[in-house]
Amino acid sequence: MPPNSKSKRRKNKSKQHNKKNGNSDPEQSINPTQLVPRMEPELYHTESDYPTSRVIKRAPNGDVIVEPINTDDDKKERTANLTHNKDSMDSASSLAFTLDSHWESLSPEEKKTILRIEKEEVFNVIRNYQDDHSCSCSVCGRRHLAMDQEMERIYNTLYAMDKDKDPETNPIKFHLGIIKELQISKNQQQNDLSSTKGEVVKNFLSSSTVGSLKEEVLHFKQKQLSKQEQAHNETADNTSLLEENLNNIHINKTSSEISANFNSVSDEELQQKYSNFTKTFISSHPKIAEEYVQKMMMYPNIRALTDDLMNSNGQGFLNAIEDFVRDGQIQASKKDDSITEDEASSTDLTDPKEFTTMLHSGKPLTEDEYADLQRNIAERMTNAYDTASKKFKDVSQLEKELFTRFMSGRDKKSFRELIIQSFKNKFDGELGPSVLAATLSSCFSSQSKDTSLDTDSIYEDEDEEDYDDYSEYAEDSEEVSEYEGIEAVEKPEHDEKSNGIRETLHLSYDHDHKRQNHPHHHYHSTSTHSEDELSEEEYISDIELPHDPHKHFHRDDDILDGDEDEPEEEDENEGDDEEDTYDSGLDETDRLEEGRKLIQIAITKLLQSRIMASYHEKQADNNRLKLLQELEEEKRKKREKEEKKQKKREKEKEKKRLQQLAKEEEKRKREEEKERLKKELEEREMRRREAQRKKVEEAKRKKDEERKRRLEEQQRREEMQEKQRKQKEELKRKREEEKKRIREQKRLEQEKLQKEKEEEERQRLIAEDALRKQKLNEEQTSANILSAKPFTENGVGNPVSSQSHPNMTNYQEDNSCSINDEILKMVNSVAASKPVSPTGFNVHDLLLPSTNNQMPAMEQSHLPQPGNQNNHFGTTTIPNALDLATKSSLQTENNYLMNSQTLENTSLLMHNNSSPTKLLPNDFGLSSWGGLTNTMSINPTCKPPVIQTSEMESQAHKSSPQATMPSFGLPNGGTHRKSFTDELNTLTSMLSSSGFADTSLSSSGFPPSQRSVWNDQKSSFSGPSTAGNFNNSSIQSGMLLAPTLGSVESFPNRTSIWDSSTTPMMNKSELSGRNITSTAQDSPAFMASNIWSSNSQYNSPYLTSNVLQSPQISSGVDESHILDSIYNTYLAISPQDSLNPYIAIGTLFQNLVGLNLDYSTFINKLISMQGAYNCEFFTDNNGSITHVRFARQTPAGHSKGLLNQLFSGLNDPTATPFTSRPHTSTRASFPIASSTTQTS
């Protein structure tokens, strides 16, 4: 843009000329006079009244001067201009520091993203700049493509050169290497400055002395190891610092005071004192300390400084430090008119509050917070100072910056006191006052030296860290390696670090860069600044990019100088030198150098734009967060306001509630007073009534005592009468018991005699039966042998032929009359034997042979041994307690009685080679009336009547397939019906093997598959037709009982062989359709070893509970009568409105009258009623029965046995001997008869 006025152009031209002259020779820019601070007079007492003509001032060195007060307008204008310039510089410095702080706040990943610059991005920056800032020359105006091609060629050439040096170079590393060159050039300038300052040291020490000291220092370092290593590295620097301070500081003490001090102490003692102080403060090396003492004695300034440190605790030295910092700032501002980032940083040192406000997000700190910050910085710097190395360690850049600003700020005195107090607190115990003062001086000198030597050192560490961060990023991505060639530059003597990437962020265009000497130059001003303010856009201004092919140097003037334009003379000569510029060619090296610088500027501009974009983005986030916080604060205030109102309302409500409570309390007190008065009246009335009541009760008591006395006399008389009556009854009872005992004794004797007679009769019958059976067996054996001969001769293996069936049938018909006669005789003998005798007998005893009747040895040797002996009890185990001889007789008798039937069936079955098939249910492996069949396997031949016990025991454990037997009364094969004689034979065999009775489900508590053939095995019954009672019988544990399959169809049960209520015999058609099966080997059941034993338990897996069976029931009450009585009692006491209510078991037991049952027997009877009476129980947690319920229906009637029909008409004249029924007039002990009569 064109300049605003001619005066400004002239001003800019003069500034440009000054910059050229100032930067032409860096060594000449250092003026020795600048080392001496300028004396600026100031008012000693600003509030005092001074004469208008003059004013007394104090110089920095302590001298008093008198000057007139300047009141002219020129001075005011100059002051205003200086103030304006200072504000502009402060604002620019504040912005620079803000950007630096923003860079430090970025994460490593964000820094890497910003530093990652691609090739296309660099060229885009150059193209965009050319579009915005095009010159008026022929080449630039035409925007020829050759410029872009030339820049790309130069870029590729430079990249290839770096690639040759470092094969691992990539575009990103190449860009960072170009930027690194700016950092190297800056370090070179600092090295030049250090070498210039080194001349001062040479003036202080001779060259030979310096060389010898260096050798001694190197030798001494090897001995002192790590503790003295850092101190020796800083020895030369400390010496230089002291010399520099001596040249810039005026001591406050006058020469007279110094001479007085010297006169007070002898030279020798003073020198020794100085030597000790030097060894402590300067260096512990003896030669260095001695050299320092000698120089100190030669130069009064050094001596005065040392005395101040030793005597006044360094107060004068502190003032000197402040003056040095101030003078250093003034010197830095005078070195160059162009204000760089270094100067901006140094001029910003006087603004600690503004700096802390910026760090606090624009919010000023309070006085307390500011004081706390100063105290923390003072303590932190005190703790970080190392007395051995005389340097600060582990101090962050921010803490260093704050320390420098506080030391040069407006409140420097208070901060200085904090520093002194902190140092005293830490080192007072370790060091003396002189050493403490020396330590303070060394601390401040170290800090000031770093500030004076490099005004940009507050950023150096962070810059190096930034570059290191990117190096780490490059190593991780395997794209960038170490820049060995770039980092090989020598570092300064003080070991100062390089400026890093941040130096490029503030780079405008290097002032040391020499413009080429050719006639055509284009100066394009890129920004015009307002004189009133400096914005961020002015700070991050567009950098002038030189058009390399045409030698156009587009340079941006200094950012902080305001509006600066090119000189008019150069603008006027633009058109004359265009062609000459193109013709004046440069060699390839100059082209590459110019291209590298152009790329440097483009990368710098790109980094600046990225930093600004990141900064603005972060500011936007901060503003957004701040807005959210403000909104949250408003909500919080609103919520607090609402809560306050709510509390106020609650307080009012509480107040009203308390008032209401007070009113209620007052009302309650009035009511209590009324109640108290009322109670007093009632109490008086009660006392009066109580006195009256006592009088009445006294009279009544006397009457009661009289009446009680009469009753007691009458009671005594009645008791005497009752006692006499009981004595008479006791005598009567004893007489009756004696009579009863005599009768019982007689009855027992009669029973004993009766049993002896019965035993003799039974033995006789058994002997006869044995002889008859022996004959029948011999005849049958001979017949079988004869019948088997034809088959043997013809080669047929079946020993029994179907042709022998007619012979067997004839044999059966011939012997049927004799067998029937014997059975009738047996039954009549039982019915007619002593009906009035009280002794009991057992029908089964009549059918058992004597145990002493054994087969002769000869007959046993001639009997054939059966090939397949089946166990009569299936898989049952017969214990040794059973009388095997009796069982052998039982087996022989069964074989004899069933011979005529089983022989034919067996021959037919064996002929057809039939395997064991389904059999009828057999509860215990024996024949029963409920099963209607005998499942015992009968061999074709008759067994011997008596079998040895050992042989029976061995056969009891054998098992073999059983031959299928036809059901009782069923024809074999469905074509032949047995005669009545055959049925009687089968029934007789069943009767002799199993017993006379079977118990139905209504009279036992067990399932049909487990009922005993002797009815209830633990109960004995008495009937009217018996002559005595049976003994209690039970099944002992260990006896296995044959189970019944669940699929077997149950048949009608019979309770007595005399009962005539059974259903008619099934005809052929009904039974032929049924599949009645039973297998002895299905599952185990328990059977008693002795069916006559008592007081044992059933051990069957089918039992629902292990309840002991009832003991003996008193004679005269049979099973069905007991069960009916229990059921009727339940119906009587149960409520009628309920269908089937539960009744307590104790209530039912107490209402049973006349049965004489104990509780355990009662429970057993209830269990036996489950099936027939639909009885249900309710138990508690322990399993005990507590309640019982019966269905309201008629219990199932007891089935009548078939023998009841057979013997129902024994006394009928028209009946046959097998259709008559015996009668008796006395009670019998048959468990199967309810009530029968018998006639003689």
Curated annotation (Swiss-Prot):
Residues 1-76, 446-593, 634-744, 951-980, 998-1029, 1214-1240 are annotated as: Disordered. Residues 1-20, 514-524 have a biased composition (Basic residues). GO terms for cellular component: cytoplasm; P-body. GO terms for biological process: negative regulation of translation; response to salt stress. Residues 616-777 form a coiled coil. InterPro entries: Fungal_stress_NST1, NST1. Residues 457-487, 558-587 have a biased composition (Acidic residues). Keywords: Coiled coil, Cytoplasm, Phosphoprotein, Stress response. Pfam families: NST1 (PF13945). Residues 39-48, 488-513 have a biased composition (Basic and acidic residues). Residues 25-34, 951-965 have a biased composition (Polar residues). It is found in: Cytoplasm. The modification Phosphoserine is found at S266. Belongs to the NST1 family. Interacts with MSL1. Present with 217 molecules/cell in log phase SD medium. With MSL1, acts as a negative regulator of salt tolerance. This is Stress response protein NST1.
